[in-house]
């Protein structure tokens, strides 16, 4: 699952990547291929040079035809540069404007890692005019693969089944499962999920869509509310279906076996699906406008994916069939009413079918207001904030990345609201729920800005969230470009600077469920770092030599390092100088 930052990086890199691909085609096996970009400069002498080698680990084997990307943090002042490694793995980029850059390397079938062979997302370089940075080493290692075959109870191939490779992440202070990769089986029942980093995963297979069952369910006669012959869970006709199955062979995610993948692994995971008694969810949609209907969707709270659905019958009843045990959110969306409406309800399916779920859709809310920016002249940025380049984002308080599981109330709702030049903004058709407001965008205030206050009816709601339950909510939002700054150097136990260390400002415990309160950066080749836009408050600074992904969002992970962090108190506009000792990574 790509983050917003990854998507932004992709869009930024697209022109450069296309140019590099053309260069590869033209240069073939030449020793060094170079493509440069960025703004024009009158004197080449003021430009920097970067060169190094790309190797495959273990063994330090040279990697040819790797795409090297050098991306400026500040696109207004720097540029984007690319090169392609030669047969000896070497690369050379020249004509680089001064600034702070991120350096990445990509090659099909390989992933970038640090010296401890933990997945890395590039490194940071700070380049001065005329500086030459040489002897860089970018390490790649083989990606892992999960492959296998899915068959039915007779051993026949099961085509179009969805196989997912899952990993555990933490969002909003709670565990969440996300897809690291997924593929559908082919006509032979075979699948192959590639490009996986070393780590711990779980593998699941979901049967192909049962369109026949869905059509039959939608066309079934509704049962009357006073029908005493209606089936109860113990009286329901015996039905069987294929269920989502976890490796090696269980429908209970809690009993799934973890799969530990190492670099270059080709792990075989075969499945044989057998029909088993299926559970269902029955209920009704009430209080609908005349002639309105609703679509029912079942969203997994573990995976934040819509897994199943049903159509509402004429009397408002619905049946969702073939439900596996688990934690869900059930959604009812009404889109053919004069005003979009929605209902959502959390439920747990254990060992029996669920009856009598009652959903009462409500109209979406209207959240609007005005954003103003304080301290523009005092901030660290290079000019006034361009309000039209600012976005505000609603994120549900319960930690769901997608409050609607990928579905919306018609065309009127989006999580993101663009701020107009006069500071006004609005969200239309907001589903019922409680939301945090987040700041995003590329205003001229730079990276030192932060969200200072969110008022609803004169009351501060930044900590509790904004409630939406139909009707209008007016917000007065204040941002500041005068966020705190923490800068310094990361050193090892011998006092030597450490490059590419991951520095994270972790907020106090009560705010750790809100990932936007964290601040993260990476030290450059001299061990220097700067954390920008820190909201006033209490923090703990950590510097890891190597850290797996975003493990620092996991409260259990942080418990292991409680005594190795440095306390930081920062006020608005304060600039703190800190010296951090790196937390060593595990030995190779």
Give residue ranges: language-model regions.
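Long luminal/extracellular ectodomains of secretory-pathway precursor proteins
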Residues: 2-5, 21-22, 26-588
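N-terminal secretory signal peptides that target proteins for export/translocation
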Residues: 1-14
């Amino acid at each position: 699952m790509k983050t917003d930052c990854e998507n932004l990086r992709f869009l930024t890199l697209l022109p450069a990547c296309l140019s590099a691909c053309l260069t590869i085609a033209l240069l073939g096996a030449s020793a060094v291929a170079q493509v440069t970009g960025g703004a024009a400069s009158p004197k080449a002498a003021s430009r920097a040079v970067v060169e190094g080698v790309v190797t495959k680990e273990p063994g330090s084997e040279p990697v040819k035809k790797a795409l090297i990307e050098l991306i400026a943090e500040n696109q207004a002042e720097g540029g984007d540069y690319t090169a392609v490694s030669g047969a000896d793995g070497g690369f050379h980029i020249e004509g680089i404007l001064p600034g702070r850059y991120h350096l990445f390397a990509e090659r099909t079938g390989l992933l970038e890692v640090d010296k401890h062979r933990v997945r890395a997302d590039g490194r940071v370089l700070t380049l001065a005019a005329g500086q030459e940075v040489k002897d860089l080493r970018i390490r790649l290692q083989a990606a892992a693969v999960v492959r296998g075959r899915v068959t039915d109870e007779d051993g026949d191939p099961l085509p179009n089944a969805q196989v997912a490779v899952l990993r555990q992440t933490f969002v909003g202070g709670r565990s969440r499962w996300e897809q690291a990769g997924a593929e559908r089986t082919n006509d032979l029942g075979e699948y192959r999920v590639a490009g996986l980093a070393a780590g711990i995963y779980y593998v699941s297979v979901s049967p192909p869509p049962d369109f026949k069952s869905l059509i039959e369910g939608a066309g079934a006669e509704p049962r009357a509310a006073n029908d005493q012959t209606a089936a109860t869970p113990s009286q329901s006709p015996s039905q069987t279906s294929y269920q989502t199955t976890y490796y090696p062979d269980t429908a209970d995610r809690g009993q799934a076996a973890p799969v530990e993948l190492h670099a270059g692994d080709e792990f075989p995971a075969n499945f044989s699906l057998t029909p088993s008694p299926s559970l269902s969810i029955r209920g009704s949609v009430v209080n609908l406008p005349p002639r309105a209907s609703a679509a029912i969707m079942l969203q997994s709270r573990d995976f934040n994916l819509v897994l199943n659905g049903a159509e509402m019958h004429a009397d408002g009843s619905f049946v969702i069939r073939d439900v596996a045990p688990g934690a869900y959110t059930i959604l009812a969306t009404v889109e053919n009413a004069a005003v979009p409406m929605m209902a959502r309800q959390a439920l747990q399916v254990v060992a029996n079918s669920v009856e009598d779920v009652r959903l009462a859709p409500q109209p979406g809310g209207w959240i609007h207001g005005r954003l103003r920016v304080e301290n523009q002249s005092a901030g660290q940025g290079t000019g006034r904030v361009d309000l039209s380049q600012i976005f505000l984002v609603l994120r549900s308080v319960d930690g769901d990345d997608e409050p609607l599981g990928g579905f919306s109330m018609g065309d009127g709702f989006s999580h993101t609201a663009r701020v107009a030049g006069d500071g006004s903004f609005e969200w239309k058709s907001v589903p019922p729920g409680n939301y945090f407001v987040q700041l995003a965008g590329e205003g001229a205030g730079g990276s030192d800005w932060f969200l200072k206050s969110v008022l609803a009816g004169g009351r501060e709601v930044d900590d509790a969230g904004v409630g939406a339950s139909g009707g209008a909510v007016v917000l007065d939002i204040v941002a500041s470009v005068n966020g705190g700054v923490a800068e310094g150097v990361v050193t090892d136990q011998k006092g030597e600077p450490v490059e590419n260390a991951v520095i994270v400002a972790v907020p106090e415990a009560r705010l750790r469920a809100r990932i936007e309160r964290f601040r993260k950066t990476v030290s450059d080749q001299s061990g220097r770092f700067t954390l920008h836009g820190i909201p006033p408050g209490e923090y703990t600074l950590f510097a890891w030599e190597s850290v797996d992904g975003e493990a620092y969002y996991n409260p259990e992970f942080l418990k292991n390092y409680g005594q190795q962090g440095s306390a930081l108190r920062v006020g608005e506009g304060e600039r703190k100088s800190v010296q951090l000792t790196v937390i060593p990574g595990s030995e190779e």
